[in-house]
Amino acid sequence: MSNPVVLNLHLISDSTCETVAAVARSALEHFKSVEVNEFVWSCINSYEQIDKIMLTIEKDKYNFIMYTMFDDDIRKYLKQKAGIHEIPCIPILSHVIREISCYLNIKKDPYINTSIGLDDEYFTRIDAINYTIAHDDGQNLWDIDQADIIILGVSRTSKSPTSIYLAYRGYRVVNIPLINSIELSVDLSKMKNKLIVGLTIDIDRLIEIRRARLVSMKNQNNYGYVDYEHVLMEIRETKKICAKNGWPIIDVTQKSVEEIAATIIQYFTKMQH
């Protein structure tokens, strides 16, 4: 079997690199056989920084540069340096900007500082991630009123990964496990301005997931955790609570975290209008 092609992908931006990274990763989805080493160079705004990047690049390897750079002089310098070493250097936004400029017959602004907006978005996302991690699995509910979204569900219904995914999108999320015979420590029925969503799942699939969990934890004596009647009662109680309060409920059976999160975002967007 031949060795895979290894590509050193250098992502360069005068801001956070999130835009160029998203485009690059999407493009590389079309090359599954390629092994990618990703190097992220953010907040690059000087000739000296570009010189340092070039010094770190292993010239005898496959290298590829993708960038977003709004300062014309810095951008030209980057392309010049890449050209000297015969490294492909691709601007991900230039073609789009050029097409808009030609279509409208308007010149683009010579310089526009996008770093402020991106930085605001970045720090909002970091704040959402920190908040969501601190409020995983029903923890720290004293400031639940600061959440954008509250997720309820029995154990192993993808509450935590869905919450983290939403946090990465900038939503502050609390997830709370619903456990039989244990009352919630907060009265969610009074939180009229919050999106509260319940997650449910096919009982056979849930038991299968829980059994695998017990095996991985070497704790196969927790019979109630996988008992059919007990699990059925948990699922029914979740549906009952959501129906009583008019909260939407999502069946996560065979759904990816991305699909679950997309549905929740749709509910959230609808609630805001």
Swiss-Prot record:
From the UniProt record, list the reaction(s) this protein catalyses: N(tele)-phospho-L-histidyl/L-threonyl-[pyruvate, phosphate dikinase] + ADP = N(tele)-phospho-L-histidyl/O-phospho-L-threonyl-[pyruvate, phosphate dikinase] + AMP + H(+); N(tele)-phospho-L-histidyl/O-phospho-L-threonyl-[pyruvate, phosphate dikinase] + phosphate + H(+) = N(tele)-phospho-L-histidyl/L-threonyl-[pyruvate, phosphate dikinase] + diphosphate
* Domain of life per record: Bacteria
Which major enzyme category is it? transferase
Q: Which Pfam families match?
A: Kinase-PPPase (PF03618)
Q: Which InterPro entries match?
A: Kinase-pyrophosphorylase, PPDK_reg
Q: What is its EC number?
A: 2.7.11.32, 2.7.4.27
Gene Ontology MF terms in the entry: ADP binding; ATP binding; phosphotransferase activity, phosphate group as acceptor; protein serine/threonine kinase activity
Q: Where does ADP bind?
A: 153-160
Keywords, ordered alphabetically: Kinase, Nucleotide-binding, Serine/threonine-protein kinase, Transferase
PANTHER family tied to this protein:
PYRUVATE, PHOSPHATE DIKINASE REGULATORY PROTEIN 1, CHLOROPLASTIC
Q: Outline what the protein does.
A: Bifunctional serine/threonine kinase and phosphorylase involved in the regulation of the pyruvate, phosphate dikinase (PPDK) by catalyzing its phosphorylation/dephosphorylation.
Write out the similarity annotation.
Belongs to the pyruvate, phosphate/water dikinase regulatory protein family. PDRP subfamily.
Q: What is this protein called?
A: Putative pyruvate, phosphate dikinase regulatory protein
